[in-house]
Structure formats: C-alpha cells, structure tokens
C-alpha cells in the first residue's frame, strides 16, 4: 500500500543539490525514528470516526462544487 507524505514538497523527491546533502541525511534519520501506529480497522470507534470524516468531506466537496448553498 502506498502512503502519501504531505510533509515533503515535490522538490524533495529530486536528487539533492550540494547544499542539501546534509539535510537529506538528517531527513532519512527522522523517518526511521518515526513510530508506526497500528489501528484496528474493525473497532466500532474507528468505523464511527471514518463515517464522520467521510460525511464532513462530502459536505466540503458539495460546498466546493456549489458555493452558493
């Protein structure tokens, strides 16, 4: 499964320039230290939260499509 990383800009996917080589090494270090969170997708709280998020997103899309309402 692919994950979207919203923390990095598209420019960071390119090869680093001479001044960015030090940054690339430290960025890799923080990614390795990141904690992986295991979410139970069958839990009732998770399903409830997902439905709430989906509902808000649908309302947002509807308002975005028809700003007069």
Swiss-Prot record:
Spans annotated as Disordered: 1-47
| Keywords tagged on the record | Phosphoprotein
Task: Note whether Oxidoreductase occurs among the keywords.
Answer: no
| IQ domain mapped to chain residues | 46-69
| Domain of life of the source | Eukaryota
Q: Where is the composition biased (Basic and acidic residues)?
A: 18-31
Which intervals carry biased composition (Polar residues)? 1-15
Residues bearing Phosphothreonine are 8
Which family is annotated? Belongs to the PCP4 family.
Q: From the Swiss-Prot or TrEMBL record, give the protein name.
A: Purkinje cell protein 4-like protein 1
């Amino acid at each position: 499964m692919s994950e979207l990383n919203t923390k990095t800009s598209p420019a960071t996917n390119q090869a680093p320039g001479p001044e960015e080589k030090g940054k690339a090494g430290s960025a890799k270090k923080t990614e390795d230290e990141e904690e992986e969170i295991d979410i139970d997708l069958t839990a009732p709280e998770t399903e409830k939260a997902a439905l709430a998020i989906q509902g808000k997103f649908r309302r947002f899309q509807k308002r975005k499509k028809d700003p007069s309402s």
